[in-house]
Amino acid sequence: MFYHLLYPLHTAFAGFNVFRYITLRSIGAAVCAFLLVLFLGPLFIRTMQRLQIGQVVREDGPETHFKKKGVPTMGGLLILLSVTVSTLLWARLDNPLIWLVLLVTLFFGMIGAYDDYKKISKKTSEGLSAKGKLLLQIAGALIVGFFVYLHPGYDGQLSIPFMKNVQPDLGWFYIVFAVIVIVGASNAVNLTDGLDGLAAGPMVVSSAVYLLFAYLAGNVVLANYLHIPYVAGSGELAIFCGTLFGACLGFLWFNAHPAQMFMGDVGSLALGGALGSIAIIIKQEFLLAIVGGVFVMEALSVMLQVGYFRMSKGKRIFLMAPFHHHFEKKGWSEPKVVVRFWIVSIILGLFAIATLKLR
């Protein structure tokens, strides 16, 4: 909105010319989203407490989690509000990629909100059925998959880190691949959101890295120089990534141990869906496995645990899954698990950036 309202005035006052720069608007979007969450957070917490919308805790979970029962949840609504407002204020609204990512993010948020509502209303950790949730996620991911495959300028080619001349073309199967990436990312972030600040921290890192890659992918000179796919208009997604960065950082203010509120499925499913969608749109799909390594690790731990449990008829690989619970069972304190996972996330984020030159 600022671009459309203020940039045209640069002919009368040169200072308004700054609104054409993606870098400035990305910073503005991040700061705006951060401040929105920071200032609205206390009001949101009081409102959730008054409405008695609190966290439901698993009976078979670690005993240290029982004290989390009743802590305000669905903080993802606040994240989505700040992301939406900041995006509408700072992004170019004539860019279809902005609308695509924003609407898909909100759609995944709606899935999570309904899931949270069912959990809270039933006072149980079981919400929307796994099959129902998966079908809705697939429907949302298909929107991105079909858009990317059918939109002029896109194709079914993959961009593989470390290999500048290897770009396999999946053809129509790219749509299926896109669904796997987006749905997988959404569920991976959801599984990670089990400790105070555990999901928000890596999301800050991931959104910062994808902000950089979105900016580079939207600049034809830099994209060609770095041997990454050029995607016309994707530079504006740096602004959306900025809103994710700011919103998650602001949320972390209240979600750090001991948490004053949780994001709920409305937050985790939406953030994961947003991350996966951005990865698909800017053609940096495999980079997500690196920068989102913490999310991947958490998801894999659940799949391995369930698979091995069934194959071995009752035996387990980990003391408890997802992976963060394994370390809790080993005696690590919650803050220690979270901070160490943050450290891993930062290292992976830096490594992801390094892939720009390791080709």
Curated annotation (Swiss-Prot):
What Pfam families would the database entry show? Glycos_transf_4
Q: Which residues cross the membrane?
A: 27-47, 71-91, 93-113, 134-154, 170-190, 203-223, 234-254, 262-282, 286-306, 336-356
Q: Is Coiled coil found in the keyword set? A: no
GO CC terms of this entry: plasma membrane
Q: What is this protein called?
A: Phospho-N-acetylmuramoyl-pentapeptide-transferase
Gene Ontology BP term (one): cell wall organization
What does the UniProt function comment say about this protein?
Catalyzes the initial step of the lipid cycle reactions in the biosynthesis of the cell wall peptidoglycan: transfers peptidoglycan precursor phospho-MurNAc-pentapeptide from UDP-MurNAc-pentapeptide onto the lipid carrier undecaprenyl phosphate, yielding undecaprenyl-pyrophosphoryl-MurNAc-pentapeptide, known as lipid I.
> Catalysed reaction(s)?
UDP-N-acetyl-alpha-D-muramoyl-L-alanyl-gamma-D-glutamyl-meso-2,6-diaminopimeloyl-D-alanyl-D-alanine + di-trans,octa-cis-undecaprenyl phosphate = di-trans,octa-cis-undecaprenyl diphospho-N-acetyl-alpha-D-muramoyl-L-alanyl-D-glutamyl-meso-2,6-diaminopimeloyl-D-alanyl-D-alanine + UMP
Q: Which UniProt keywords apply?
A: Cell cycle, Cell division, Cell inner membrane, Cell membrane, Cell shape, Cell wall biogenesis/degradation, Magnesium, Membrane, Metal-binding, Peptidoglycan synthesis, Transferase, Transmembrane, Transmembrane helix
- From the Swiss-Prot or TrEMBL record, state where the protein is found: Cell inner membrane
The family annotation for this protein states: Belongs to the glycosyltransferase 4 family. MraY subfamily.
Query: What GO MF annotations does this protein's record show?
Result: metal ion binding; phospho-N-acetylmuramoyl-pentapeptide-transferase activity; UDP-N-acetylmuramoyl-L-alanyl-D-glutamyl-meso-2,6-diaminopimelyl-D-alanyl-D-alanine:undecaprenyl-phosphate transferase activity
Identify the cofactor(s): Mg(2+)
Metabolic or biological pathway: Cell wall biogenesis; peptidoglycan biosynthesis
